[in-house]
């Protein structure tokens, strides 16, 4: 009769390819990037969350390399701009590490705009940085985005999620600014969650642009943003959505 596997290491080994590059085992103790985790646990206890800062920069630069190679293959003449989404981690040490890599920022809520201002006040970013403002625009979020734009953050780009939002910004923007439009993509068949509550439908985008943006001196359309609920997969669904977006 085979031996019953009931240890945590058994679960790890049958679930993951282990050990991975970051991990090693020495004398039955786990090391992470040559850092003895048991020593840290003895000092700080558990549960414990560790942020390994060098990994942030390596992953950002990996993404840049992948895009640069792909762009070179098709002779794409544009540029790739990596934007770090602040909601993935609000910790200052994470943001400061990420921003060492010539990147830009994406916000999702009113709270995030305070982070942008704090980064500027401490000299970590300047007013030329791209600030992509996604998410549903509640009144405080609209007010905070406008305060950024009105104070000279020239590359702050609110992404319009519904037709009413553009009027909210018209009322509070004192200068001209760039805007984006979020496209409402179709859901993948059999997907359990409905995530296209935000965005403007393909068929409405041109009319919306002509009516609300084209002749409004406060706005210049800079971006079309579309969100695919399952991320980038090599499937007919993904490529069909992409074709609809760019055609």
Specify the residue positions occupied by each region the protein language model found.
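Flavin-dependent oxidoreductase catalytic cores
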Residues: 186, 195-210, 240-244
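C-terminal active-site-proximal or functional interface alpha/beta core segments in diverse enzymes
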Residues: 8-10, 230-232, 237-247
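A charged N-terminal "starter" segment
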Residues: 1-177, 181, 206-210, 214-220, ...
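Domain-scale recognition of functional cores that engage charged ligands
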Residues: 202, 215, 228-229
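Active-site-proximal beta-alpha loop/turn segments in soluble metabolic enzymes
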Residues: 184-197, 223-238
